[in-house]
Regions:
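Metal- and O2-centered redox machinery and metal/ROS homeostasis
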Residues: 1-184
């Protein structure tokens, strides 16, 4: 299954992202609003430069199966930016392109995977001092539907991607992780 293949082959990228965002501080309750601003801003840049490209690559074949309209996160993270008084800016020096729908699915794997962790982050930070006024639009995007949305995504991915396309899917995931890790 391609979802397992991606999990195994992107683990080092996932770990690097956790390190970049000081994720260990979330559970020790030492994560600050400044740390949160960094994670939101970086994820905003990732979504700004990828979401439309991913969706346009997938729209015809996967639009309904993946419920793409319900998966749009850019408007949600823009609300978080506004509530944190952060600027909407671009990362023009970083180009992000996906060659085909398989790469787009790989990139989407990174974004959808972040919603699983994001849900945990939102719950944890809502109990952390200093986060009383923070809205979690992006990290809480699916709320109680996080599990079912992830399950749907994985099922479509595992059903629709043939083994000969695993490398292309992995390539898309690595492209997006590389962008995320280097955009700031």
């Amino acid at each position: 299954m391609v979802s397992e293949y991606l999990k195994q082959n992107t683990a080092e990228y996932h770990d690097a992202a956790e390190k970049l965002f000081n994720s260990e501080k979330i559970f020790s309750k030492t994560f600050t609003v400044e740390d949160y601003k960094k994670i939101i801003h970086t994820n905003y840049l990732m979504l700004l430069h990828s979401e439309d490209k991913i969706f346009s690559s997938l729209a015809d074949k996967f639009g309904e199966k993946l419920q793409l309209k319900q998966r749009a996160k850019l408007p949600l993270i823009e609300k978080d930016l506004a509530s944190l008084a952060l600027e909407n800016r671009t990362a023009d020096s970083h180009i992000l392109e996906f060659e085909n729908e398989h790469e787009a699915l790989g990139a989407m794997y990174v974004i959808e995977g972040s919603t699983l962790g994001g849900n945990v982050i939102a719950k944890q930070l809502s109990k952390t001092e200093g986060f009383d006024e923070v809205t979690f639009n992006f990290f809480g995007c699916y709320q109680e539907n996080t599990g079912p949305m992830w399950k749907n995504f994985k099922e479509v991915l595992d059903t629709e991607v043939a083994e000969e396309n695993y490398q292309e899917v992995l390539s898309g995931a690595k492209k997006l992780y590389t962008f995320l890790l280097n955009v700031n």
